[in-house]
Amino acid sequence: QALYSAPKEVFERLSAFAANGGTLVATFKTGFTDEHVKVNCDRQPAGLSECMGAWYDRFTAPKNVGMSGETFGVSKDELQAQDFMELVEPTGAKVIAFYDHYMWKEYAAVTKNSWGKGTCYYIACKTSSAYIKKLTASIVKEAGLWGWKQEIAFPVIIKEGVNQEGKKIRYLFNYSGKEQSVKLPKEASKVSRVLKEEGVVLKKDRLTLAPWGFVVEEI
């Protein structure tokens, strides 16, 4: 989701986060207005154009606009700009994907820019689910944040948090009406205790969740 409205200070902190070694990913319509929903007159994406190494001042609704460049193995049918696209011009950023269209082929659809110790990515259009999944997986892996939890996809959901006692808690949910089975690595079996479960079967490294089943663990 785009950070459509926010005060200038928020974007300054995001830029500083990336400069200090973070990975920042922003999408189309980010920074379009301030906290009062007044359109920013700065170069778009306002407050982030410098760290993104790219900017735009025009946008349009795509019609039969494909994407070229890094495809991540996604089929041609899935390489389409959808609903909204910004005509981004790089000022230092590397272009990951261009628009595949005779009128818009010089403009960037996805960019990557080194900023201080970190990296900034800008996604200038709505893409297919298949493409955005591949793109974000690539970004997470490059940032060194990919682990076994990222291998598990919807409808099995994993959430973690800290309870009032300061204990780390993990929740695994089956958000569907069908039984789901996932393979767990050894590190996932390091559980202090199971707090609550419903419709759960664990055999060796295979966890099976009944429809709408869940397990809550202290780890």
Question: Where in the sequence are the language-model features?
Answer:
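A conserved amphipathic helix/loop scaffold
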Residues: A2-I219
